[in-house]
Amino acid sequence: MTCTVTVLPAGRKLSAQPGENLLTLLRSANLAPEAPCGGNGKCGKCTVLIGGKPVLACGYTVSGDVTVHVTAAKTHARILTDGYGAEVELQPLRDGAMAAFDIGTTTVVCYLLEAGTGHLLAAASAVNPQQSYGADVISRIQRALAGEMEAQTRLIREQMGSLLGDACRQAGVLPETVGVISVVGNPCMQQLFLGIMPENLAKIPFAPVLTKAEVGEAGDIFPCCPHAALVTVPDISGYVGADTVGCVLASGLDREEKRTLLVDIGTNGEMVLGNRERMIVCATAAGPALEGAKIRFGMRGEPG
């Protein structure tokens, strides 16, 4: 027997087997509410309405035809696009505009840059759609190991393609003329983007897989950019990623004579102390202090 789950206000009808978990079903259709704890019943924030009553989607088992009202997960984000940085001489691999992605655990950003000069042409950002698999990297690793990696990979690639399209429209640039696409993120976000199972990040010694810069073809992941090169920046360790490498290069810390402290406050937070001779790096979870993932009352800095 197959059950029909009607999802409002999307107006979608989903087929489910008796005993199927509602949150898992909604995830498969990209209709899931936010689930900061990854669907473990700890945060109480994947609430949906069934028969006018609030129910946690992660704890509801489909047993028959049902109508579910789902509040859409947040998709928009505001980002800072201006700031101070070091002058970096650019040597593009290929002609055409350049796109740079920062895959954050919470926010994903696409910058479109002019080749040669690095002048910012446009920027687009959105909330990472993997949020329904958990607000933190540990939750997403657990869901990937439970068989939901391909779904997370599909979600992030689709969103990055959409953001690239938005940035190109803003700048009046044809996507097929983009020559280089560069991607940074913490190790988990990079591996999920590339479709690499993050099991290495779930066990000691948490060794990174991406230990050197890689250059490949972007067309398989971004069909709209068939001629672009895809550049992935290396990770430093299991929980210090390519985004930190990007911070070091953009700030010029790798060329500083005096000791300098660099702090990246995100869902995954990093600190770098040093100069061009030596750097010491550490990471910690900053998200719980800012986003309320696993506390009873709390949320991101957003409307609500």
Question: What does each model-identified segment do?
Answer:
Residues 129-170, 294-298:
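N-terminal phosphate-binding loop and adjacent alpha-helix
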Residues 110, 118-136, 199-213, 255-304:
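Glycine-rich phosphate-binding loop of actin/hexokinase-like ATP-binding domains
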Residues 52-101, 108, 179:
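Fe-S ferredoxin-like electron-transfer domains
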Residues 32-64:
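Local cysteine-cluster metal-coordination motifs and their immediate loop/turn environment
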Residues 80-96, 230-260:
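Conserved phosphate-binding catalytic cores of ATP/NTP-utilizing and phosphoryl-transfer enzymes
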Residues 98-102, 178-182, 260-264:
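Short glycine-aspartate micro-motif
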Residues 136, 178, 192-246, 290-293:
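Glycine-rich phosphate-binding loop and adjoining helix at the ATP-binding site
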Residues 39-42, 61, 101-107, 113-116, ...:
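A short acidic Gly-Thr/Ser loop motif
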